[in-house]
Swiss-Prot record:
Organism of provenance: Bacillus subtilis (strain 168)
InterPro entries, alphabetized: YfhH (IPR036289), YfhH-like (IPR014938)
Gene: yfhH
Subunit annotation: Homodimer.
Domain of life of the native organism: Bacteria
Name of the protein in question: Uncharacterized protein YfhH
């Protein structure tokens, strides 16, 4: 039985990320788009567990990785930041903290 990311050590997480990245590269080479999307999401989640949620603050606004969107955190629950994108302030959503970047 596989371990949950929350139960893995940083070394195990880095090993898992490397393994998933290799699988994602192969899926992309073979044009398996669905598999690539799943693997990229797993990589994002594993990276979130390498970060410290205490480095992210409710009320702060961050840029969402690979988009032009900004995201304001309402609260944190584990490695997920709950809040609102500036483009859709009525719709609350949760994002892994690994996709949040400091605004420039």
């Amino acid at each position: 039985m596989e371990k949950r990311y929350s139960q893995m050590t940083p070394h195990e997480l880095n090993t898992e990320i490397a393994l998933l990245s290799e699988k994602a590269r192969k899926a992309e080479q073979h044009g398996i788009i669905n598999e690539l999307a799943v693997l990229e999401r797993k990589i994002t989640m594993a990276k979130a567990y390498l970060l410290n949620p205490e480095d992210y603050s409710p009320g702060e606004t961050y840029r969402v990785e690979n988009t032009e969107d900004e995201f304001t955190i309402s609260y944190l629950n584990g490695v997920f930041a709950w809040g609102y994108r500036t483009s859709s302030p009525q719709q609350e959503e949760a994002l892994p903290i690994s996709v949040l970047q400091e605004k420039e």
